[in-house]
Amino acid sequence: HLRGVFSHDGDSYSAKDIETARRKSVIAQERTLKFAKMCRENGFDISIVGIGSTPSLANDSDILEGITEIRPRTYPFMDAFQDNAMNHTWNCNAFVLATVMSKPTEERVILDVGAKGLTMQSRSEGICAVEGLGNLIDYPDTHIDLMYDEHAIIYNKKFHDSVKVGDKVRIVPVHICPVVNLYDRMYLIDEKGDVEKELTIACRGKLQ
């Protein structure tokens, strides 16, 4: 039984500015509403018409009449993409904790997390453009430069001189959505850095 239709205006991620993202959102909504109308005209009782995505909806895009749900799904956590789209005014709430494993040169630092823990996603254009493959939240202007399966490399002398082998660092993923799906558990941390609760990732491995 078909109850509804939904769309995701993913091209808003590459919009050159906020106004363009808003226009893309309206176009996507109009297209989705048109498809819902076609379904109804062909005998389907469509009660749900849903839209995304976070870059446009979080920047106050208009919601057209007939839209019944919105899905800015990155909103609870945010990430480096959205941090840029929001002009660095929103807090990122999800981090990957990594360990400094090696400092083999005067500016190179190697961490114990790689593509299997952060993904290789990046974006070079648009409001969600980022530099590097993950931001180090506690070290301004520091990002991951290279990444392999199980380790990441940072070329930054200031960061190099600020950490020692064994230190823990918090990484803001470039795109949090696939990162959450890479882990079995996540931890809620209070303002002091203490673990308040361990959560199981309910949708882990549910893609098949």
PLM regions and their residue ranges:
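Active-site loop/helix belt of alpha/beta enzymes
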Residues: 1-86
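Solvent-exposed alpha-helices and their adjacent loops that cap or buttress functional pockets
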Residues: 41-43, 62, 93, 102-103, ...
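Active-site loop ensemble at the mouth of alpha/beta enzyme cores that anchors a bound cofactor
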Residues: 21-24, 55-133
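Generic structural signal for well-ordered, non-membrane alpha-helical segments
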Residues: 21, 25-32, 93, 147, ...
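Short, glycine- and charge-enriched coil/turn segments that flank and shape catalytic ligand pockets
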Residues: 16-19, 64, 86-89, 157-164, ...
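C-terminal accessory subdomain/extension
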Residues: 104-208
